[in-house]
């Protein structure tokens, strides 16, 4: 590989001084880091003399794999002693210190636990559910013990109430979570109260100089910038020359205040507002309409914004005099100190509880490791173990991790790699200040060396150029953490892309016309998704991309496309609309508790606990499980209009007029009562399993868009309930309440992961996409407002700037935000905006070849004004105040392009090619969005008013013999299992009838087992096969697969005793120990199981009677496959009982099915060959190679 000059400098670095590698997106930092380590090995060093810290376990595994690959390549290149040395390194690699800092911290604890008196028999508290329950118990005990304390009661009054203390508990948890990531948690907790100790006055000390005064200056400066812009604008408007003097007076007013503010005297600032009012507005002198439009659209808003910004200084800060603020600060100090004391008490109790139970959580691991490292003898011993300490993703470490790494290094062997522009984990307490400080110091030549890698080997030049055009005007040290210019900018360095490959950045804006009469159902969200769907349809099959592996152009396919989103909130809409367009989709992990399929089960549990809840009851009845429509629900309501809906349902089940509906509801009530009895006598996990079995809900959701993910989510709910049961968390009501409290915990309740390599468009959040790259990227919802929730609430807290609270007067109960809260909240907002800016950078730099941006605006005129901030034209970066005033990515992108002179503000739509940057902007409305026009045209044709009947024409139509009758009877969508009979008899068209909405509606529920009295009911072959497949899916092929292991696996995953007993363990053990099972074990790293796929197949390839090539969408789930030496082996489990001619019947029945699987894998992996197709006949213990 040809390395750049800076890459070679990193690779050749000798660890006799600290090095910071600032590696931009796509700069090959991991490749360079691997090569650096390899070159150190060639110099005679050993891999076990390196500490390599990664951000995630997955990154550590990738690092090891790539190092192994590089060492193996070196072994083939080298000879003699050097070759033997590399072979030794290969043996040492698995035990090398390559992993997360969590794992390294545990290594320290395991060896030196006695230094801090830790019990070595501890257990890792890895289960977040278990930790949450333990936190809840300790917090409840802590509060119960303090209710007699007057200070605690005053604290409770300030943040909660005696009857509802959860708000205060949440504040304690938040402070504890932040403290856990500091090297000295108690010291940090004490420090956050410092801003309330104002003995020297309000305009003295660090609170004034570092927080309050800069923010007042910022507001005044914002007003000044806007006024100067307005003044410059009216100089060219003859009718508005009178405004020049008015604006000059306003400019003088604001400049005067800035001067007073620099005097550090609160009273003088207050007096200035009292004695100097805003000047009286001027009047225009003419009737030039063009000038009037310009003034109204541009100048007038700037004047208003300037006035508002200036007056906010008085309304937010100067409405109280200094003595009043000092009095509130003094009283608030007592509240803050009590909150800190309460947090410390909880921390101490929680630590004691964990020691009592011999538990350690991950934060303990790093805290204890840091404490051990404070022992000088131990610290020096650990330092002596490593020749070099390397850390990847350095921008995302926290204060505690920084201190651990600094202590482990010897002061001159610290190798740090990262990109400040990609620091996006503030919600995990990551602190980019560590990177920023070293970047500044090293750039000035103090403390270490800085090497910048700005060459981008990922993206085509159009992506890199567009990203630079946006961030050149947006990011600087003040907002973003780094000045985006020079070596920091991306430099497209991939010379493999064809020179004639002309791709442009594509910006699409949906124009929401509030005055139009369009359907309210057609909203911005749907419109943006429709735009993306239409563009994807236009791309796939009709466009080509450059394949970087083959070095050739090839047709663009679905898996080349990824849609990035800021959050998971649009995913259901994306799935629904994409289904209409027949676009396969793969959605990455979100919060599974909030997904549709899980919410229905949670609603079911709610009404089992208490059926007198209208919303969850109607949700269950309306769901596909029972399939009631609005008319049926309304009819049930009429049975009892005075009481709740459940009472009406009970009445209807007795006297309903629709006999079918009455019978259905009577059966529902019997079933509900049965579930209530199960809930009373069994664990929650048993109840959930029973619901799954009775309703076939998991099987139904498998047929929906994203079926495999939905099934995984339902299984995750079952496993979560199992975890709670294992931790002695009992009671349906308590379970429901607990889940409701944690519904917003996206990080703790991520969806079960699915394979992203399927032939489908991928959808994921920007966070999930970090570190990945995709040929085509769509970034949607550009106009989504930047989230600023953590700068609101009763308490705001920041690592560097302390805590801000609302003060509640103990007698009057009047609530007022402290001046500290106002200042800290503003600082938090700045950090939020900076992180969102870095998130936008991550999103844009995921694209390799094409970038599509989609957003909306209520009025294009408002959007244009939002983008036009001429205050900053000619400056290197847009004014800080303008960037902070932006509320979305869309605002930032537009104002950056406008201020760079790339786009015209009189009409933003169009194709732009300027300064080597090419992009286009398109606007859409409800009439112009692709496909919507066609749909609406069809609807209008169907709704045409009848004016007469042409009988001759009608007869001709009715007598018409349709030549494609057979084709019209075919379903457009099939599951592979439904095609099984076609493979057995290609002439058969007897496909299973499918309801168009595929609803498993229950018209008559089965008789409950306790009524029928059939205690000997056998497990069905279907249930047995499903259970067997589930166990085979869960097997860890790296473990010894014996009877004990399988019984434990069954116990964890199959709650029903009879189903457990029906699984034939000897057949699974036979398979695991077979020659083929041994192959799977060897290929465990590439093994994929339960992989869904969807593909289009010409109908005539399935049905011999059909002539058309129209495609049929086939969906299926492959039991498993693995890749070895570039060849794919796929396999499928079968539990059929055939007896005679076992092998031939399995071949006959399933060869077509596996051929489809092979075709699907060939489309997913176009460069790999499917070598073998294996049917695993479990009943006959036969391996059948097709």
UniProtKB/Swiss-Prot annotation:
Protein name, as recorded: ATP-dependent helicase/nuclease subunit A
Species of origin: Oenococcus oeni (strain ATCC BAA-331 / PSU-1)
Record-stated family: Belongs to the helicase family. AddA subfamily.
Source lineage: Bacteria, Bacillati, Bacillota, Bacilli, Lactobacillales
Subunit comment: Heterodimer of AddA and AddB/RexB.
Binding-site positions, ATP: 23-30
Known function: The heterodimer acts as both an ATP-dependent DNA helicase and an ATP-dependent, dual-direction single-stranded exonuclease. Recognizes the chi site generating a DNA molecule suitable for the initiation of homologous recombination. The AddA nuclease domain is required for chi fragment generation; this subunit has the helicase and 3' -> 5' nuclease activities.
Superkingdom, natural source: Bacteria
Pfam family, any one: UvrD_C
